[in-house]
Amino acid sequence: MRWLFWSSGSQQAPNSNKDNNNNNDGDDDNNNIIINNINRRPPLTLECPSPSHPPCASCSTKATTSPSNPKRGWNTSLTARDWAGEFKDPRNLIPTLLLTGGILFCVRIHRQYLRRIPLATNISPTYFHKRSLFGRVTSVGDGDNFRMYHTPGGRLAGWEWLPFRRVPRVKKELKDRTIHIRLAGIDAPELPHFGRPAQPYSHAAHTWLTNYLLNKRVRAFPYRQDQYGRVVATVYVRRFPWIFLRRDVGLQMLRAGMATVYEAKSGVEFGGEGKESKYRRAEEMAKRRGRGLWKGWKGAGWESPREYKNRMAGVEGERAAAGGGGGGVGGMGELGVNGGKN
């Protein structure tokens, strides 16, 4: 019997060990399942037992890290960064300074060199005797004045070849968009206006200036404005085949005998004493050769543009005194800078 007891016990022992091993394996599986479930759970947030509970580490952690915290401020992430250090970082500071400086430089260049001036009355006094105006001649009104469409920067700024940088050709589109320029230092014969008859060679002078300047690109150096809204300026043009040489338009008119040096007691602009002497030498040369209006200038009845203006002013003054009422208009021609209005 004892042998049977111990034998049966010895036979069951392996089975019991096997069962124990199976139970241990089952426990391990259950532990793994529990651990996996714990890992899948969202992080625990500990709450204080009551509002009067003093702040603790867990509460602080919850207040700063819990995404569902309704008391979290919108600027928490902003104040958490060291922005002073970020701004002082050369990797951020240098590009910012370069970008800001580049924008300010472009604005300055545009204001000084690329901003278009529509009318002579819009020209800043800082231009006079210091700056120049570049543009295309759109019309010639008389033998010594014309209108120019300002094209700052020329072709380098896109004028004449970019679609939005075209010079208008229609007279309606040019209204109030051109600069009225009076050639400095010269006086051309007067066309008929204000009821005055045309002066000899006035049409010839107008035709000469039209052929010389119309639709050409010119550069004007302004000196001042007159009372008619025109700007008195020395004008240069480049003409084929000598496109690399600038030609003084006023000087060329004097050489061709189509104008005289402007004579007045005050208000004359030449652009310097050297230019005035050059103008007078050119006039003297044309006078000796009898060019243009100087043909027969020694004969009776010949008069210069200045003498013509003075004579017309006297005639209109006599009419005004006699009650004709024509002196008011006639006086405009005498008061103009560098001659009459036209």
Swiss-Prot record:
Primary residence: mitochondrion
PROSITE patterns attached to this UniProt entry: TNASE_3
Subcellular location: Mitochondrion; Membrane
Gene3D superfamilies: 2.40.50.90
Chain intervals with Gly residues compositional bias: 322-342
InterPro entries xref list: SNase_OB-fold_sf, Staphylococal_nuclease_OB-fold
Bilayer-crossing regions: 93-109
EC number: 3.1.-.-
Record: residues binding Ca(2+): D187
GO molecular function annotations of the record: endonuclease activity; metal ion binding
UniProt GO cellular component terms: membrane; mitochondrion
Enzyme class of the recorded protein, top EC level: hydrolase
Membrane-topology annotation of the record: Single-pass membrane protein
Pfam families cross-referenced by the UniProt entry: SNase (PF00565)
Protein name in UniProt: Probable endonuclease LCL3
Organism from which the protein derives: Paracoccidioides brasiliensis (strain Pb03)
Lineage: Eukaryota, Fungi, Dikarya, Ascomycota, Pezizomycotina
